[in-house]
Structures are given as structure tokens and as C-alpha cells.
């Protein structure tokens, strides 16, 4: 019996209601800029699909980041470019400035705005309770914006969240795994990085949606408030689900699987065992207690849910009590009345409705 499909609780109809050229990235015609206008300065890092350099635009002396793509299918390159173009100007989304092609290797390179990033492994150890709330609220602005534009990021993790600690600015980067959401569509489960993979990916449930990003955000929140990086530390994709089950419980996992008629890989029979759901309070210790509040645990509990349809949406998350101090500070800075704890989002109006499961 096939799994029961599900549908996003919000923004489900964004792409079906837009012209085909908005989401049909395979038909997208790339407009190539002039590579001679850019000079590389130093290598910043490398990923599975690219090498990243700091550079500058010679005509303006403007600092830029240059992402040189490794040979991958043209379809994947077009998808990343189309998504970045669609999201250009969105709150806290890295800005794509230009697309150029190396004349010798024929390799495409993406030119981005420069962000003076702080290394997250050092930065996260110094963040106060308020800082964590502040930066997660900024990240939620980016997530609600991309979701409102019909796009799932599918690789939310600290490495893809650039923070300029001096300017207190945040950018969500690396849209190479991002995809357009279409209701009832099956997607590849080989996305996201292991420690941030939602249970839906680990049980091979393909009909997922934007809520995948909210699980990853929950993993980031847990690692930040408990000072445990990463929070779920699996040795492989199978062990990753075991680590989650040891915290969220195995009974709850089996309920989720039954609800969606998911067939669990037989390999889990030997390794899952039986585990009770743990209270979040058990992860508090002397070094992290200043970061853990009742509202932080309530917020975390509403993100780290097996059932993707039960997780808070980005817009709901922004309205959570956890962000009240941030919203109040925003309101004071803007000289407006305090917005009773509701996070104002710059997205399209929420199409929120009850969680839907077809045929349930």
C-alpha cells in the first residue's frame, strides 16, 4: 500500500497559481555576465558542489563572493539560479548579483553580495539568550519569505546561515538543494545534511514540504540553547533516526509511520529498540541553563515533531512567545506600539488551514 500523501498547511498553491515560467527552471534561459569584471582574492571554502572565493568587482571595487560550481547536471544549476533570481531582494536571503561562465572550463560561477561571516562554532558559544532569539527570528524571516514564494530550502544548517556579528545581520545561503513546492509531489529524500535531516527523509517519505526546513531550524535551536553541536549526532542516516527516537520516543515514531502508511526499512528492526519520550529539561546543565527558558522549550517542542504537519510554520514560529523580547525591541526601535508578540512577516498572506492528509 503506498504512503498517504500530505499537503503543506501553508503556501501550498503558490506555484500552481503562478505562471509556468516562475517555477519551470528547466526552460529558464540564463543571462551570462562578464567574467572579466571580477577578480578572485582568496579561497573561503569548498563544498560538495562548489568552491567559494572572496573577490571584487573591478569596475566598482565592490567586495563579492564567487561560488564556482563543480560539474553537475545543467538542470541543477538552472534550478539554483532560477530560485536565487526569484528570491532576490527577499529579507535575509543572500543576493545573487551576477552569473558568469569561465571561458576555458565552461564552469558557471555565481556572484553574490559579500557577507563578513563569523565562524558559527566560535560565535554560537558566545551568544546570549537574547542573541539566539534575535538571530533565529532573522532566520525565520528568510524562511517565511522563501516558503511564501513556493520554495523549500532543504539544507538549513549553521554552515548555511551567515552571520555578521558586528552588523547583527544574517543571510541564508546555499540554495543548491532548494526546490519548488508543488502539492502532492514526491521529492528526493537525499537532501539536507545528516544532523539536520527531518524524520520524513530518514523514513523515506517523499511527499514532504516546507515543514522539513522547520525541523532543521529546531535542530539548530536545540544545539544553540543546550550548547550541544550537533544536537542529534547520528553516525549514518539509520543511526540518525535512532538518535531522534531516543529523545522523541519510539511509540511516537511508530504512530507517525502508521498515520502515513510508511513502510519502515527492515534495517531499523534491529537498531531502533524501545525508547520513552524524554523531557527537554533533562538536557539542561550548569553551562546552558542561562539559555533555557520555559518558552524556549515550548518553542522547541513545537518544532521537533515527527509529524511534519504538526510542526509550526515559519510564520506561526515568529508569533511564538519565545520571540516576544525581539518583537518588543523591534517595536521600540520603530517607535510603534508593541505588536502583542506577533511576528510581522514580509511574506504573502498566510494560507494557513488545518493539517491535511489525503484519504486519512
From Swiss-Prot:
Alphabetical keyword list: ATP-binding, Behavior, Cell projection, Cilium, Kinase, Nucleotide-binding, Serine/threonine-protein kinase, Transferase, Wnt signaling pathway
InterPro entries: CK2_alpha, Kinase-like_dom_sf, Prot_kinase_dom, Protein_kinase_ATP_BS, Ser/Thr_kinase_AS
Tissue and organ distribution: Expressed in a subset of the adult male sensory neurons: CEM head neurons, ray RnB neurons, and hook HOB tail neurons.
Catalyses which reaction(s): L-seryl-[protein] + ATP = O-phospho-L-seryl-[protein] + ADP + H(+); L-threonyl-[protein] + ATP = O-phospho-L-threonyl-[protein] + ADP + H(+)
Cellular location(s): Cell projection, Axon; Cell projection, Cilium; Cell projection, Dendrite; Perikaryon
Gene Ontology, cellular component aspect: axon; cilium; cytosol; dendrite; neuronal cell body; non-motile cilium; nucleus; perikaryon
Example GO molecular function: ATP binding
Highest taxon, organism lineage: Eukaryota
Ranges for region Disordered: 334-360
Comp. bias (Low complexity): 338-354
Domain Protein kinase span(s) in chain numbering: 38-323
Cited Gene3D superfamilies: Phosphorylase Kinase, domain 1, Transferase(Phosphotransferase) domain 1
Quaternary structure (record): Tetramer of two alpha and two beta chains.
Annotated family: Belongs to the protein kinase superfamily. Ser/Thr protein kinase family. CK2 subfamily.
Protein name as annotated: Casein kinase II subunit alpha
Organism from which the protein derives: Caenorhabditis elegans
